[in-house]
Amino acid sequence: YDLNAPASIYNKEMLAAGMTDEELAAAADTLQNMQWRNKAINDTFQPGSTFKILTLAMALEENKVKMSDTFNCPGYVVIEGAKINCSKRAPGHGHQDLITAFANSCNPAFINIGLRLGNTTFYNYMKAFGLTGKTGVDTTGEASGFVNKEIEYSTLALACYAFGQNFNVTPIALLAAQCACV
């Protein structure tokens, strides 16, 4: 990396010899974009279990769960005819309290928690946490999270969202939302 020429490609070995000028220019553009891409703001991903802290925060705030609540995990649940597995498939985690369900990252427990919240409340929290748009960070190229409209009415969508699947967020938006929980 040359501080005086930040747009220069630092890994010239990746540029193959024998290319036409057009091919070389295209390859250089691709390498430059890869070199400067900020994945924390430019890319989105499904947060998976890293989202469970937000589901738990929503449920605690709304008094939908108590620390004394218990959950049974047989290794899967069926929602609207779709079988959703836990990370620990049958026989599952079995009987567990809230803290253990969180520690086990138990999908059926978090589906149960999400269903207690309901679609409208869950979606409103996603908006409040800033997960349906851009964070507004002062830089270019920030991507927006992607939340399907089906979260507003589909029990299956809610079940999947509760453990961080079927929607996309940027890493910076997820971190900002998680920081709001602390």
Regions found by a protein language model. Give the residues of each.
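Beta-lactam-recognizing serine transpeptidase/beta-lactamase-like catalytic domain environment
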Residues: Y1-S49, L54-V182
